[in-house]
C-alpha cells in the first residue's frame, strides 16, 4: 500500500509542481491584484478625500461669504436704524409733543446715555412754569383824561406833504413838547393821506407853541397848525343825532325834475340806496304831465339819509335834482299844498299875513329859531292859509331857499372850523414853476403882479418870492389884518398861470423869523415896472 502511495506521489509530483507554480503565480497575481486594488483603493480614497476637502473648503467659503453678507446686511440695518433714530431725535428736538417729557422718555434717554445735566436742562425747558399760566394785567393809562381834556391837548395840522409819516410829525413837534399821539387822516378807498393830521401833546402848554410853528417847512411843505375844533364837531354830531330821531320809514321830497321823468326812472335811481315803500310823482290833471316834483318813502331812515346825501344836486336830464326832508303835521290830510309846486319855488308867491306866518314857522322848523309868542298865537288861531279854500297841507317841504341857507351856513361853519387865525402875513402857493421859468426877471414880474392885486385891498409892506421852492411860494405882509384878510379872500382859489392859488396865513413871529427885515417895514410897496 505504501508503494502504491509513493508511486502515486511520484506520478503526481510534477503535476503538483505545476500546480504550485500556478498557485504561486496565481498568488502573485492575486497579491499584485490585491496590491493594485489596494493602490487603486488608496488612490480613490485620496481622490475622495481631496474631493471632500475641496467640498468642505467650498462650503466654508460659501459659509464665510454668507456670514459676511449677513454681517453687511446687519451693519446696513444698524446704520439705517441709527439714521432713523437720529431723524427721530431731530424730529423730536424740533417738534416736541406735550407727552415727550421726562416721564415718557426716561427709558429712551437711559439707553442713549445722555448726561444728567442735559436731562435736567431739558426737563427744565420742557416743564411749564405755573406762573406763566397767569396773564399779565392790562396796563392802565397813566392819566385817565376825558375827551374834552384830550381835545385841549390836540392841534390840527393841514397842508402836509404826501410822503409824510407820523414819525416825521412827532419829530417836528417834539421841539415844543412831548407828543402823545399822531393820527394821520387817509382816504378809506385809496389809503392815501389827505394832507391833514391830529397831534396830541402830553401838556396843554405845548399847544400854543405848536400853533406858532405854522409856516415852518416839513419835508419841503409849509405846515399849517391850529387848535383842534373837536368839541364843536362833537356838539354838531350830538345835535345831528337828536335831529335824526328813531329809525323807521322816512319820506323824501324830490323836486326840480324834468317833466318827462317817470316813477320807474326815479325807482331805478333811488332803489340802490334801500328798499322803497312808495313813489308818488305829482301829475297835472289837465295836461297829464309831471309837475316836476314828487315824494319817495324809504323803509329805513338810514337809507333815506344816504340817498339825500348822495343825490341832492345830482344832475338828471340836464337839471340838478333837489332832495329834501318831509315832516308830517299832526293834523295832516292827504291833500298837498300849493307850496309843493316846484314852479312856485322858483317864482314865489305873494302870501297874506297868515300865510307869511305859516311859511316862517315851516322854514324855522329844525333850525332852532324861536318864533315870537304873538306869531305863535296867531298861528294857533288861524286854521288855514290866506287862500282859505286850500286845506291845511300835510307835508312841510324844505324849499330851495332853506336848502341854500343851510348849505351856506354849513359851508361857513366848516370854513370857520378849518380856517386858521388871521394875521398880517400870508403865503401864496402855486404861483409859478421854477423848472419852467426861463425868462430873465420872471420873479420880479410875479412880485409886481402880487403887489398890484394886493394894492386893491390895502397894500403890501413886504413881499418875498421864493424862487427855489417847488410849490411856487410867495410870502406877503400887509399893513393890517383887515388888508390881509381881504387879499387872502380875493386870491385864494383863483387861477394863475394854469394853477389854482392857495393862500394860507402865517403867524407874525414865524414870518419875522423867516424875514427879519420885515419887522421894520412900514412903507407900502409899488410895482417896479410902473
Curated annotation (Swiss-Prot):
The keyword Protein biosynthesis does not apply. The modification N-acetylalanine is found at residue 2. Residues 1-146 are annotated as: Disordered. Interacts with NCOA6 and JUN. Interacts with ESR1 and ESR2, in the presence of estradiol (E2). Interacts with RSRC1 (via Arg/Ser-rich domain). Interacts with SF3B1. Interacts with ZNF106 (via N-terminus). Residues 33-56, 64-95, 119-130 have a biased composition (Basic residues). The gene is RBM39. Antibodies against RBM39 are present in sera from a patient with hepatocellular carcinoma who developed several autoantibodies. Residues 14-32, 131-146 have a biased composition (Basic and acidic residues). It holds the Pfam family RRM_1. Belongs to the splicing factor SR family. Residues 153-230, 250-328, 445-508 form the RRM domain. This is RNA-binding protein 39.
Amino acid at each position: 500500500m505504501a508503494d502504491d502511495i509513493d508511486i502515486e506521489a511520484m506520478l503526481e509530483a510534477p503535476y503538483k509542481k505545476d500546480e504550485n507554480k500556478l498557485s504561486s503565480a496565481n498568488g502573485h497575481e492575486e497579491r499584485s491584484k490585491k496590491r493594485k486594488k489596494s493602490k487603486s483603493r488608496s488612490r480613490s480614497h485620496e481622490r475622495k478625500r481631496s474631493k471632500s476637502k475641496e467640498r468642505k473648503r467650498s462650503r466654508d467659503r460659501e459659509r464665510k461669504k454668507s456670514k459676511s453678507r449677513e454681517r453687511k446686511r446687519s451693519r446696513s440695518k444698524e446704520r439705517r436704524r441709527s439714521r432713523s433714530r437720529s431723524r427721530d431725535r431731530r424730529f423730536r428736538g424740533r417738534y416736541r409733543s406735550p407727552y415727550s417729557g421726562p416721564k415718557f422718555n426716561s427709558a429712551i434717554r437711559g439707553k442713549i446715555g445722555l448726561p444728567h445735566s442735559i436731562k435736567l436742562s431739558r426737563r427744565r425747558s420742557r416743564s411749564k412754569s405755573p406762573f406763566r399760566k397767569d396773564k399779565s394785567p392790562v396796563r392802565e393809562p397813566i392819566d385817565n383824561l376825558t375827551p374834552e381834556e384830550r381835545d385841549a391837548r390836540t392841534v390840527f395840522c393841514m397842508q402836509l406833504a404826501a410822503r409824510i409819516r407820523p414819525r416825521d410829525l412827532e419829530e417836528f413837534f417834539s421841539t415844543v413838547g412831548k407828543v402823545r399821539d399822531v393820527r394821520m387822516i387817509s382816504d378809506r378807498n385809496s389809503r392815501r393821506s389827505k394832507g391833514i393830521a391830529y397831534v396830541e401833546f402830553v401838556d396843554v402848554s405845548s399847544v400854543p407853541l405848536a400853533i406858532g410853528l405854522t409856516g415852518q417847512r416839513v419835508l419841503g411843505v409849509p405846515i399849517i397848525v391850529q387848535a383842534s375844533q373837536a368839541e364843536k364837531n362833537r356838539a354838531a354830531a350830538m345835535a345831528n343825532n337828536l335831529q335824526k330821531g328813531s329809525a323807521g320809514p322816512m319820506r323824501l321830497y324830490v323836486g326840480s325834475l324834468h317833466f318827462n321823468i317817470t316813477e320807474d326812472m326815479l325807482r331805478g335811481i333811488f332803489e340802490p340806496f334801500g328798499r322803497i315803500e312808495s313813489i308818488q310823482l305829482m301829475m297835472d290833471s289837465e295836461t297829464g304831465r309831471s309837475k316836476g316834483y314828487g315824494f319817495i318813502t324809504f323803509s329805513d331812515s338810514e337809507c333815506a339819509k344816504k340817498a339825500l346825501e348822495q343825490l341832492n344836486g345830482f344832475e338828471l336830464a340836464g337839471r340838478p335834482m333837489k332832495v329834501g326832508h318831509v315832516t308830517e303835521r299832526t293834523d295832516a290830510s292827504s291833500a298837498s299844498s300849493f307850496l309843493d309846486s316846484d314852479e312856485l319855488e322858483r317864482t314865489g308867491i305873494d302870501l297874506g299875513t297868515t300865510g307869511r306866518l305859516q311859511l316862517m314857522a315851516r322854514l324855522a322848523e329844525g333850525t332852532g329859531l324861536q318864533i315870537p309868542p304873538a306869531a305863535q298865537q296867531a298861528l294857533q288861531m288861524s286854521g288855514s292859509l290866506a287862500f282859505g279854500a286850500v286845506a291845511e297841507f300835510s307835508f312841510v317841504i324844505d324849499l330851495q331857499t332853506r336848502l341854500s341857507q343851510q348849505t351856506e351856513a354849513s359851508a361857513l361853519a366848516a370854513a370857520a372850523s378849518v380856517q386858521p387865525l388871521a394875521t398880517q402875513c400870508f403865503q401864496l402857493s402855486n404861483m409859478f414853476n421854477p423848472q419852467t421859468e426861463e425868462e430873465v426877471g420872471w420873479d420880479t414880474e410875479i412880485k409886481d403882479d402880487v403887489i398890484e392885486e394886493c394894492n386893491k385891498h390895502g397894500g403890501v409892506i413886504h413881499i418875498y418870492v421864493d424862487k427855489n421852492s417847488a410849490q411856487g411860494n410867495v410870502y406877503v405882509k400887509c399893513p393890517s389884518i383887515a388888508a390881509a384878510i381881504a387879499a387872502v379872500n380875493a386870491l385864494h382859489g383863483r387861477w394863475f398861470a394854469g394853477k389854482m392859488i392857495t393862500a394860507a396865513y402865517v403867524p407874525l413871529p414865524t414870518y419875522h423869523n423867516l424875514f427879519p427885515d420885515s419887522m421894520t417895514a412900514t412903507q407900502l410897496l409899488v410895482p417896479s415896472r410902473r
